[in-house]
């Protein structure tokens, strides 16, 4: 049990590298994810297609790779599963021992209602700003998973009575992955004497789900991503965005995944559906050569899994705030904060550093800190010519 549960987070780290807001951008990640108005033209396809054209004199650029992973275990589920694995082995060896009965029943009871989350992704982009129509071709992959047990009261009673039987309590992994291949196109228009950038992103999507269900004492990390647990589908989707800039002030609005899509998981004792629905985000930013301050507000909540079993609380509606301080174009210090209006996620502090010698090579790293059991990191490399 201990080895397999801990290894799950490692497995998702590698899975995310080929699986897909659904984006990783180390610069904006460090700024709390507030990229709707503050992202640069290389990452515009991830946040707001209008930003490709906001600075038409920018240089040709390449972003690759950008990669990140986040692990959130607010209820200490991983530790709880490890503890249960240890005491359950002792119980099986001597089910009549009263200490084994008490420790095992308590360990199983403590798993009830706990949940852990894992997410990660990778991406890359090529951007060509022009004075007419600017373009950003990008590929990004992202995956997220929920690990949750379903505990049976009858198992707890059987253990307390010293009955060594097969457990009916389950461990479940629900995972979703998406690969986006898109082309963000944007241009500038004059409206009431103001310059406004307008962008659109047609994109193809490859959608995946995994649904792995097994007895809580028989979880094996080598089995969760077997073909029989997988479903997949393909879809066309679209993002849109607008951005207004007056001196250092920016206001922007982005709509992502305007075409709703649902994909069902494999059927086990339950069946779930993952929902890809539109997300609208309003962003503002104050951008100068030495500092950037940004704020993003999701205008609607985002629901993910629904199903026939107990409700999975994974809907979010985020407020993000961030800042970047630039040392004359050579190094950057960043920080931010994320708050979930739906209270699904705990508040997240983000930090990051950037190095950009001669403003040609850009290397960015970020870290997110939620609590002692929840954290994340991302990194990226970019070239501007």
Locate the predicted segments by residue.
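Gram-negative bacterial Sec-dependent N-terminal signal peptides
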Residues: 1-19
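Subset of outer-membrane beta-barrel
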Residues: 20-385
